[in-house]
Design a protein with these regions (language model features):
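Short alpha-helical "recognition helix" segments of helix-turn-helix
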Residues: 47-55, 102-103
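Short coil turns linking two alpha-helices in DNA-binding domains
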Residues: 54, 58, 109-110
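Short, amphipathic alpha-helix enriched in basic
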Residues: 34-45, 87-94, 123
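Sequence-specific DNA-binding recognition helix
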Residues: 92-132
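Amphipathic alpha-helical interaction segments
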Residues: 1-5, 28, 32, 84, ...
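Short, Lys/Arg-enriched, Trp-marked, Pro/Gly-tolerant hinge/linker segments that flank
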Residues: 8-35, 39-50, 68-79
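Residues in the helix-turn-helix
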Residues: 61, 72, 112-113
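Alpha-helical DNA-contacting segments of helix-turn-helix folds
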Residues: 66-84, 88-89, 117-136
Length: 139
């Protein structure tokens, strides 16, 4: 992306400038969308349609931006929510919260869906992660 923007700044040929401007704008827009998603992870109404509306683009355009990084909006959202939940489960400051409260705060509305996705991604259940905290801190 830096090379694309540099080509524009240095006055590349017309085709190079058009491609670079387009690529740079797409990268900047994807970055802005990802930042927005990260700030709204706990929002249970966070959808590709809602994000697209906030950025004044179509849902399909948002999906295409994520496809350029070999992922999807839904996958990005899921992985970010799982990461937040795992950090909270491992953090002693959240020891008083239940697994379901942490899942809800991370943006999951369905506990069984959360448990299934968490286990699939991390290879252990949220409860297993929570139970291992004292051992991890003692090591």
């Amino acid at each position: 992306h830096v090379y694309d923007l540099a080509a524009v700044a240095l006055g590349g040929s017309g085709d190079v400038v058009r491609v670079a401007e387009s690529h740079g704008v797409r990268a900047a827009r994807l970055h802005a969308i990802k930042t927005d998603v990260l700030q709204a992870l706990g929002d249970h109404g966070l959808t590709v349609t809602a994000i697209a509306a906030r950025h004044h683009v179509s849902p399909r355009y948002v999906q295409m931006l994520f496809e350029s990084e070999d992922t999807t909006f839904s996958r990005f959202l899921l992985l970010q929510r799982l990461a937040v939940a795992r950090r909270m489960l491992c953090d002693p400051r959240f020891a008083d919260r239940t697994v379901s409260a942490i899942a809800f705060e991370a943006g999951f509305g369905d506990l069984s869906h959360f448990n299934r996705d968490f286990r699939r991604h991390y290879g252990e259940s949220p409860s297993d992660v929570r139970a291992a905290i004292p051992r991890r801190n003692a090591s």
